[in-house]
Structure formats: C-alpha cells, structure tokens
Curated annotation (Swiss-Prot):
<keyword id="KW-0687">Ribonucleoprotein</keyword>
<comment type="function">
    <text>One of the primary rRNA binding proteins, it binds directly to 16S rRNA where it nucleates assembly of the body of the 30S subunit.</text>
</comment>
<dbReference type="InterPro" id="IPR001912">
    <property type="entry name" value="Ribosomal_uS4_N"/>
</dbReference>
<dbReference type="InterPro" id="IPR005709">
    <property type="entry name" value="Ribosomal_uS4_bac-type"/>
</dbReference>
<comment type="similarity">
    <text>Belongs to the universal ribosomal protein uS4 family.</text>
</comment>
<keyword id="KW-0150">Chloroplast</keyword>
<keyword id="KW-0934">Plastid</keyword>
<keyword id="KW-0694">RNA-binding</keyword>
<keyword id="KW-0699">rRNA-binding</keyword>
<keyword id="KW-0689">Ribosomal protein</keyword>
<dbReference type="InterPro" id="IPR022801">
    <property type="entry name" value="Ribosomal_uS4"/>
</dbReference>
<comment type="subunit">
    <text>Part of the 30S ribosomal subunit. Contacts protein S5. The interaction surface between S4 and S5 is involved in control of translational fidelity.</text>
</comment>
<dbReference type="GO" id="GO:0019843">
    <property type="term" value="F:rRNA binding"/>
</dbReference>
<dbReference type="InterPro" id="IPR018079">
    <property type="entry name" value="Ribosomal_uS4_CS"/>
</dbReference>
<dbReference type="GO" id="GO:0003735">
    <property type="term" value="F:structural constituent of ribosome"/>
</dbReference>
<dbReference type="InterPro" id="IPR002942">
    <property type="entry name" value="S4_RNA-bd"/>
</dbReference>
<comment type="function">
    <text>With S5 and S12 plays an important role in translational accuracy.</text>
</comment>
Length: 201
C-alpha cells in the first residue's frame, strides 16, 4: 500500500489530530459525531484506527510500518515503546520536531532534495535513524537556509522535547539522547497497534 497523498482534513476528522501530517485540527466534537453515526466501534476497528493514526502521522506505507513493528518485536523492552522510539528517531520526524519543517511530508521533501546535513554530510534518506550526538543542519546554501527559516518563523512556539536542542541562528539541531516515551508527538495507544499486527499473523 502506498503512502497517503489524499485530503488531509478528511483523515484528521476521522482519526483526530495528526500533527505530523497537517497542522490543521479537527473541529471540536467532530469525532463524537462520527462515533454516534457509526455506533459502537468493534475492537478490530479500534485497533485499526490506532494503527492508521500512527501510519498517517509518520507518513509511512503499510509495508514500512510492518517492518518497524517486526524490528521492535525483536528488540529488548516493550514492543510498543521501541516502535515509537524507532519512528521518533527518523530524520524526517526529528526535523519536524525541531520546527525545521512544518510537517513530516515537508521534512521528507527537504531531505529528498538534499537540503539537510547530518554530522556535516548530506543525507537524502528520510528514514535515516538518528542517534544521540547527531547534529542535524541545513546545507550552507541560501535556498536551504531560507526554507528552514520560513518553517521556524511560522512554527507556533512549543516546548521542545528534551532529547533535542535547537540552535535556530545556526539552522542546526542536536540529538541529545533517545526519546523518552512521554515526549512522543502523538496521542496514541501503541499497544493497540502491536495487537493489530499480532492478530494479522
């Protein structure tokens, strides 16, 4: 299944706020109206919606998300927590969380068009897994810096997660540590996502 490129507002109306996909928010009460129209949700549908929330927020294909679930399942610790850490430490998400891109699709575009350096080298893979002490910066070119400056200027002031440091005047961010689960940028029940996939196999 390919990455979603359809109307974004339609998705947030059904699934709730997805800040990685769009900075628009559903109108208050719209999810309650949707629920009353559709009646009581089945357990399968609840798990499916949590999975879709994760997929659309991080802008993943079905195959990519399944791959991350399998990697998380083989790692030490809670599969759900490891899954969120893997997704949060992607380069496109780090750029978004730093405010250097307005959305995750916007961050992906910056990376694909070779505007971003990691530790002084161009990285053009949005799924690149960032590590503690990685430095993320704009290329030393006017266009690259202008794109990031536009995003920094238009981003609403929000508390930066404690695993990141932003140096806006240098168009640069630093990864301090692996993200703590309380700083994940999406309201999600990750256990339902893991359950969804465990029942598919």
């Amino acid at each position: 299944m390919s990455r979603y490129r359809g109307p974004r507002f339609k998705k947030i109306r059904r699934l709730g706020a997805l800040p990685g996909l769009t900075n628009k928010r559903p109108r208050a009460g719209s999810d309650l109206r949707n629920q009353s129209r559709s009646g009581k949700k089945s357990q399968y549908r609840i798990r499916l919606e949590e999975k879709q929330k994760l997929r659309f927020h991080y802008g993943l294909t079905e195959r990519q998300l399944l791959k991350y679930v399998r990697i998380a399942g083989k790692a030490k610790g809670s599969t759900g927590q490891v899954l969120l850490q893997l997704l949060e430490m992607r380069l496109d998400n780090i750029l978004f969380r730093l405010g250097m891109a307005p959305t995750i699709p916007g961050a992906r575009q910056l990376v694909n068009h070779r505007h971003i350096l990691v530790n002084g080298r161009i990285v053009d893979i949005p799924s690149y897994r960032c590590k503690p002490r990685d430095t993320i910066a704009a290329r030393d070119e006017q266009k690259s810096r202008a794109l990031i400056q536009n995003s920094l200027d238009s981003s609403p002031p929000e508390e930066l997660p404690n695993h990141l440091t932003l140096q806006p005047f240098q168009y640069k961010g630093l990864v301090n540590q692996i993200i703590d689960s309380k700083w994940v940028g999406l309201k999600i029940n990750e256990l339902l996502v893991v359950e969804y996939y465990s029942r598919q196999t």
